[in-house]
Amino acid sequence: ILCHHYFNVYGILPMMWMFLDRLIEGKITRLGRLEFEPKAIDCEIRLPEIYLPKNSVLLNVHVPAGPRLTSADITDAYQQALHYFNGIVPIFHCSSWLLSPQLDECLDESTRIMQFKKDYLIYSLEDNADQFIERVWPDRENEASDYVNYEENTTLQKNAKQLLLSGRILQKANGICIKYYHPESDNV
């Protein structure tokens, strides 16, 4: 989809080869509107709500490009994943611009993106705006750092552009969703 979007031809973008490899090997499973991949985390996660040691296997969540993501889509996909991956700790992990703390300044909390984001506890941030810029301005014809010419067709584009023009950075965040994890019920 992205290659067709950017170049008007179907194909694979270089950055997608690593992801495609995991998809072909059957490591990533699409369930409803989301994609899931059991994956060991490469760091320990210490949050007030939970501690996860390094190499804990979680369900990595990928949000593929496509139609708008609704709350019902998210709940349905999570429920399917809980059944499909029965036996894996029901904690979802996501590394995405969709969890960026800067979204709090760009969007109203009632938006679909914020509804997705609110389920996640953020444990680390990456100062890499590439994914954020690529997804928010997919039609840009200018250099990634030429913020002045970025479109302002949506509330998100308008507000994120103002952050960039003020010298702020848009971050990618890593987070976990523990709302389906109930250790007292022995749900693993």
In which residue ranges do the predicted regions lie?
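Conserved beta-strand-loop-alpha-helix junction that forms the acyl-donor binding cleft
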Residues: 92-103
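Non-catalytic substrate-recognition and accessory regions of acyl/acetyltransferase enzymes
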Residues: 1-69, 87-91, 105-188
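Conserved acetyl-CoA-binding loop-helix of GNAT-fold acetyltransferases
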Residues: 68-84, 92
